[in-house]
Regions:
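Conserved GNAT-family N-acetyltransferase fold
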Residues: 47, 102, 114
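Active-site donor-binding loop signature of nucleotide-sugar glycosyltransferases
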Residues: 48, 106, 118
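Juxtadomain coupling helices with adjacent low-complexity linkers
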Residues: 83-90, 94-96, 111-144
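Arg/Lys-rich, alpha-helical DNA-contact motif
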Residues: 1
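A short, hydrophobic, proline-anchored segment that marks a local hinge/packing element in signaling
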Residues: 99-108
Length: 144
């Protein structure tokens, strides 16, 4: 039988903790938060948290896939070997959607990112990037 994605890193047991932490971020930013892992040449949404108070927000399912070369989540995974701290994209996966994601570093064999996506087309990078980078760092710490 196929093991759940990320099982070799204990991702399932930490997913609940991540979801609780990211619910607060999703609420404060009014944006959807996600934990994404690489599966071959695709980005796979492992966990998604949506804000509860917004009239409109980006919604997508756990298990959704897209090419690693598109979207902030996939592009952030591509930053694992570089010095850049995060990736920002606009309209690459859905017209009007803008994302910001940071790679999860320091876990051997894991290619993953943590990020947010919003519909309003603007992200205050100075405010949001440090939160997302910190969240990605926490995921890495918990999985080491």
């Amino acid at each position: 039988p196929r093991r759940p994605m990320g099982a070799e890193h204990g991702a399932d047991k930490h997913r609940v903790t991540w979801l609780e932490q990211q619910q607060a971020e999703a609420e404060s930013l009014g944006s959807t938060a996600h934990l994404t892992v690489a599966d071959g040449d695709e980005a796979l949404a492992l966990a998604v948290v949506e804000p509860t108070w917004t009239d409109f927000h980006v919604s997508y399912r756990v298990g959704a896939r897209h090419p690693l070369t598109q979207g902030a989540a996939g592009k952030a995974i591509g930053l694992l070997e570089g010095d850049d701290a995060y990736a920002v994209t606009s309209g690459e996966l859905q017209t009007g959607a803008r994302g910001l994601a940071a790679p999860v570093r320091g876990v051997d064999g894991l290619r993953a990112s943590v990020g947010i996506v919003t519909l309003d087309g603007s992200i205050d990078e100075d405010a949001v990037a440090p939160q997302v980078i910190a969240a990605a760092g926490e995921v890495g710490e918990r999985l080491r």
